[in-house]
Amino acid sequence: MTVGIFPPDIGGPATFVPKIAKYFQDELNYEIEILTLSDNKNSNINDDFSVKRIDRNLPIIYRWLKTIFTIYKLGKNKDLIFVNGLGTEATIANIFLKKKIIRKIVGDPAWERAYSKAKISESFDEFQIKNYGFSISFQKKVRSFSIKKSDIVVTPSQHLKNFILNLGFKNKIEIINNGVFIPEENTNIFTNDQINITIVSRLVSHKNIEKIIKAISDLNSPLINLNIIGDGPELNQLQKISLESNNKDNIIFHGKLKRDEINHIFLNSDIYIQASNYEGLPHSLLEAMSYGIPVLCTPVGECKKILGNEDRGYILSLIHI
């Protein structure tokens, strides 16, 4: 199994892959090995599986080659490669391995990479139809080539299935919605004078966390607390912005937390915000809803669909984000 993020990282793949790996291992008695990028040393982490971590801070070319070689090495005695990240590297390694590939698609890595580096401003859908220069066009072609080499693609939404079909994918596509465990107790919202707002996210630009911090600053209320759970390349910039805000003492960066610590914050949250420019079907949003927390989210991916007629939360206009 290949994945770009894995616990203690926070994010959809880091939530999903351990669950499905545990099911394959414990219920089906499959032999599982996981390859991921990480900021941590293997010796510092207690895993339930065989996990190989590659330092994501290595020089990009060296890291890329090391990842391909490691996938090849681990995959030689395996029957199947399950790809939930590191898709291009897995595809190249599989040219030599010739194994079956099942791939989970939750977005467009070419769009996310270009957007996070501020090379584009277009939305997910606009990106698919617009013509770009050589660099971005090449990345789009590589992404399409990699996806089309999969034997089966699994995706959480019809929107993403349409995206995959438009790439020219001819093999089987399965829509399997993301799921969460229902907690035994729900949050008690608005039970005191403080309003606790929570975000659980990778700290990357398309999540629009900077804009949420600025909006909270504009409200300038000592009664509003913003809990930001997660880590990522935008952390230092977001912390700098929060220190310049009107209510810096009420904006808390929790970093990476264990599941029980996140659950504790959910139990004390009044509002959950998901303000991304794109999502497939976000685990964190579903988890917040499972606690009965009112949610505010942008109408991207399947978010609008799962909110129904705003009886489970409210839609934020992308224009106002």
Model-predicted regions and their roles:
Residues 68-75, 125-153:
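Membrane-proximal helix-turn-helix segments that form the acceptor-binding/catalytic region
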Residues 102-141:
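Acceptor-binding helix/loop patch of EC 2.4 sugar-transfer enzymes
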Residues 277:
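Aromatic "clamp/platform" in nucleotide-sugar-dependent glycosyltransferases that forms part
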Residues 319-321:
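Conserved small/polar residues in nucleotide/adenosyl-binding loops
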Residues 239-260:
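Nucleotide-activated donor-binding/catalytic signature segment of Leloir-type glycosyltransferases, i.e.
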Residues 75, 147, 256-257, 264-269:
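Short alpha-helical donor nucleotide-sugar binding micro-motif in glycosyltransferases
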